[in-house]
Amino acid sequence: MASQDDPVQREIHQDWANREYIEVITSSIKKIADFLNSFDMSCRSRLATLNEKLTALERRIEYIEARVTKGETLT
């Protein structure tokens, strides 16, 4: 019976090692996904802010161009 326990024990230990490895991989994938989601949100926020600033600059340029075209002074 001892000879039968040895392969069974080895299989059990291998199964636990596999489960631990899978847990490490799963945890790492979750951390990567969390980072990517956070990075995405940060980029979207920064791009939205940049877009607002560019839109304001474009409007200001259009306003200045219109005043220059009409010959008005800018002061």
From Swiss-Prot:
GO biological process: actin filament organization; cell motility; regulation of actin polymerization or depolymerization
InterPro entries named among the record's database cross-references: BRICK1 (IPR033378)
Entry protein name: Probable protein BRICK1-A
Family indicated by similarity: Belongs to the BRK1 family.
Top-level taxonomic group: Eukaryota
Species of the source: Xenopus laevis (African clawed frog)
The entry's keywords: Coiled coil, Cytoplasm, Cytoskeleton
GO CC annotation terms, alphabetical: cytoskeleton; SCAR complex
Function description: Involved in regulation of actin and microtubule organization. Part of a WAVE complex that activates the Arp2/3 complex.
Primary location class: cytoplasm
Residue ranges of coiled coil: 41-72
GO molecular function: protein-containing complex binding
Localisation: Cytoplasm, Cytoskeleton
